[in-house]
C-alpha cells in the first residue's frame, strides 16, 4: 500500500544502540537475506568511505575524554586524518553501513541517496511534502494528527489518529520506580551502565518529578540526551551486558 514490498525487523540488540552497532545489525540482516544492493539516505553523496575506513583508529583507548562524547572525538579524529566531515546524522549512519559491509567482506553494493527536505533533527514541519520524523513525532505528541496527514502514508495516519501516542512521560513512573528501588549492584549490571552513571541516575530519579527534569539532571557533555534515553530503555527492560552479546539468529518479516 505504501510502495514497500517487505519490512524486516531490526532486533532490539541492534535497534537501541549507538549508530555503529545499529548500522552493523542492519547490514548483517540485509546480507543474510542474500541481497546484492543496500540503499540508504545521506546528507552528502560524495564521501570516500574507503578512505574513512582506512583511517579509523585501531583502538578506542585514546578517546576516553570524560568531558566529551565519544562520537564527536571520533569524528574529529577522522577529519584530521582525511579532511572528510561526517557530523550529520545520516552521513554518520552511512559510514556505519559502509564500515559494517567491509567487515563482512563487502557483499553489498552501496547506494547512498541524497536526503532532501527537512534535516534529521528539524522540529518544524516542512513547507513541502517531506518532513523529518522528529517534527512529525512532535506534532503527534501534541495531538495534531490532521497536520501530519500529508506527510505520512494514509494507513499510518489512520493508526496515529486512533491509537494513543506513547512517549517517555508515560514510561516515567515505571522508570523512576525502577531507578529508586533497584540496588546499585543491580543497576551496575545493566548494559552500558559505565563510569558510575548508575549513582547519578538514581539521584536524578529521586529529585525529579518529570522525565524532562530527569534528563536535565543527568545530562553532561559526555552523556547526551540520546545516550541517556537508550540507557533508560535498558533499565526498563532489565537488559544486561551479557544478554546484548547474544545476536539473534533469525530474520523476522
Question: Residue spans of the language-model regions?
Answer:
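Active-site cores that bind ATP or allylic diphosphates and position pyrophosphate for catalysis
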Residues: 9-253
Amino acid at each position: 500500500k505504501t510502495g514497500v514490498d517487505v519490512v524486516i525487523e531490526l532486533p532490539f540488540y541492534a535497534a537501541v544502540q549507538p549508530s555503529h552497532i545499529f548500522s552493523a545489525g542492519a547490514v548483517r540482516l540485509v546480507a543474510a537475506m542474500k541481497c546484492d544492493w543496500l540503499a540508504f539516505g545521506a546528507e552528502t553523496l560524495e564521501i570516500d568511505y574507503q578512505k574513512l575506513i582506512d583511517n579509523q583508529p585501531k583502538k578506542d583507548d585514546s578517546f576516553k575524554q570524560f568531558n566529551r562524547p565519544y562520537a564527536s572525538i571520533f569524528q574529529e579524529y577522522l577529519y584530521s586524518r582525511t579532511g572528510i566531515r561526517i557530523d550529520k546524522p545520516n552521513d554518520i549512519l552511512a559510514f556505519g553501513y559502509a564500515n559494517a559491509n567491509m567487515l563482512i567482506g563487502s557483499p553489498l553494493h552501496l547506494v547512498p541517496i541524497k536526503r532532501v527536505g527537512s534535516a534529521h533533527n528539524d522540529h518544524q514541519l516542512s513547507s513541502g511534502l517531506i518532513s523529518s520524523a522528529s517534527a512529525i513525532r512532535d506534532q503527534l505528541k501534541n495531538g495534531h494528527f490532521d497536520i501530519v496527514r500529508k506527510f505520512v502514508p494514509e494507513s499510518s495516519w489512520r493508526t496515529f489518529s486512533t491509537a494513543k501516542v506513547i512517549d517517555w512521560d508515560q514510561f516515567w513512573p515505571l522508570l523512576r520506580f525502577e531507578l529508586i528501588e533497584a540496588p546499585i549492584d543491580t543497576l551496575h549490571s545493566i548494559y552500558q551502565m559505565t563510569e558510575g552513571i548508575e549513582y547519578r541516575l538514581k539521584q536524578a530519579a529521586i529529585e525529579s518529578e518529570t522525565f524532562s527534569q530527569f534528563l536535565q539532571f543527568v545530562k553532561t557533555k559526555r552523556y547526551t540526551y540520546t545516550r541517556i534515553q537508550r540507557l533508560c530503555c535498558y533499565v526498563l527492560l532489565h537488559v544486561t551486558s551479557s544478554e546484548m552479546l547474544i545476536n539473534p539468529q533469525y530474520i523476522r518479516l
